Structures are given as C-alpha cells and as structure tokens.
Amino acid sequence: MFVDKTLMITGGTGSFGNAVLSRFLKSGIINDIKEIRIFSRDEKKQEDMRIALNNPKLKFYIGDVRNYKSIDEAMHGVDYVFHAAALKQVPTCEFYPMEAINTNVLGAENVLSAAINNKVTKVIVLSTDKAVYPINAMGLSKALMEKLAIAKARMRSPGETVLCVTRYGNVMASRGSVIPLFINQIKQGKVLTITEPSMTRFLMSLVDSVDLVLYAFEHGHQGDIFVQKSPASTIEVLAKALQDIFDSKNEIRFIGTRHGEKHYESLVSSEEMAKADDLRDYYRIPMDGRDLNYAKYFVEGEKKVALLEDYTSHNTKRLNLEEVKELLLTLDYVQEELKNA
C-alpha cells in the first residue's frame, strides 16, 4: 500500500515514529516505500535515529508544526502523513495550556492545511482517549484537534485529501508513561508512587498503536475516527505486576491524583456509540456529514443516545494481576529492562 510512495511522520522521533519505523524495517515494507520523511524539532534525536537505523530511505527534516512555512515546505511531494507531533503530558499542559493549544491545535491546523495545500492523498491524525469528555488542557486541545480534522474533512470534495483520526488509550512503555516510571523506581530501590489505586487505564502496546494507524490508513474514509478495543487495568494492579516481574519489595505510596487526571478514560462517547460501527477489534466512528439545515434530517431519526454507554476503561475487559503480568512480558521494553536488571 506504500509502493513508490513518500510518507511523512510528524513528531517522527517519538515513541510512535520509532515503533512504525521498526515495523517497516523488520517487515521489509520500507523496501517498497520511496521515502519516509521524519519531521521533528530535536536535531539530537534525529541524529540518533539516523545512526541507529542507517537507512537511505529515511530523510530528516528539522522543523516545528507551529511554523506553517516549515511544515508546508517539508510536505512538498508527500503522499501520506502520519501526524504524531504533540504535547501529551497532562500535568505539563495544565500548567502551560497555551503551549498545548499552540502545538496540539494550531500545529495540527498547520499540518492539515499544508497537507491539503500539497494535495497529500491521506492524513492519519493521532489522538487520545483524553479527547473524549475532556477535563484537562491536553484532552481539550486534542478534542479540538479532532474537531479541526473532521471540519476540514467535511469540506473536502471527492478525490481531495482524506483526513482520518485514530484514538489511543494508554500506550504502554511509551515515552513519559507510567511503566518506565515504575520500572525506574523499582530498579533504584525507591518508593513506587501511585496516584489513585482504583484508577483505570486502557492498555495498548506500541505494536497495537501501529496496527491501529495502519488499519485506519487502509480502511479509513473521509472523516472517520478509529478506536482499537483494548483491555484495562487499575494502576495498583499494574504496579504490583511490575513488582512481581522484577521481584521487587519496594514500598508503595498513594500520592493522590495529579493535575487534570481522570478516574477512568473513555475511548468512545455514548453519543458516538450511537453511530459507531463495530468492526470486531475496532470501532469506526463515521463523520457526521450533515450541514446546518437540521430540519431535513429530522425524519431520519437516530438511536436513543441515553440508552447507550460510552466505551471506557471501567467497562472494557478488566485484566487481573496474572493477565497484566503476561501482557507486560510481551513488551520489548520490559524484556530489555529485565536483561539489564
């Protein structure tokens, strides 16, 4: 599906960029691709990636999604875009909400506009469960990013740039996530700091995140949102699973929720569930293609939203301690940390 095509990954030196490039390299897909452009701000991370992967198909572009000119110029000749650049740390965005807006909203506007201007065939925008019923600045900014993508999708004519969204749950062992934090605390003999023991989070692997984006790329139509069904765990069970894996007796301390944290996350709202397609492993939420003349649609009717539940980390499959341990042991990151323990 990428034969002789040029692909751009914004924020390409991050967790997702590394995961998708690893997939392409191991599977041989990269041999079919004309070029992959890594667009990001950090020259050191780009240099590290260039040396580590050492592949002539990879081209590196220094730039910032906040700067329209830099993203527009880098996108000349691009066929497909995976937009992963974002500020994603919830507490940080709470303290610096304008920075979240500048990157996650205005930056996304720049990426989408540049893609349309350069006649890119398809853009996959990476979002988060925190965009559903958002209570924090990061989630609000990502929700607006989704709205931008859908609004622009609604205005596209057949044959123009296709814009799709993917929503992630918690991506295990991604940069800045709780699993690396717990493992570091365990290995350093420190107290494990748990915010709220009964708090639940979806558990997705980086492999799952790549699967979701590639599924959306292959099957997505204009304005679609895709969600992967994922199991969940409480934070306490996750911490205890890591203790067992690393044979740790570290003390656990409950420190209370951080700024902007929710007790549980939602991947699909009840309103979206009313129109979502169940695709076995995924939900597809089609774009609401109506215009502002609602009267002509009234006779069509719709499902009663009040009768539907949103899809949350509380009502999805809940993993017990042994199941969480089994899942964690499938992660390359955990295996590497065990070797170095």
UniProtKB/Swiss-Prot annotation:
The protein's name in its UniProt record: UDP-glucose 4-epimerase
EC number: 5.1.3.2
Family, per entry: Belongs to the polysaccharide synthase family.
Naturally occurring in which organism (per UniProt): Rickettsia conorii (strain ATCC VR-613 / Malish 7)
Molecular-function annotations in GO: UDP-glucose 4-epimerase activity
Broad class of enzyme this protein falls into: isomerase
Gene giving rise to this polypeptide: capD
Function: Epimerizes UDP-galactose to UDP-glucose.
Catalytically driven reaction(s): UDP-alpha-D-glucose = UDP-alpha-D-galactose
Alphabetic keyword roster: Isomerase, Lipopolysaccharide biosynthesis
One GO BP annotation of this record: lipopolysaccharide biosynthetic process
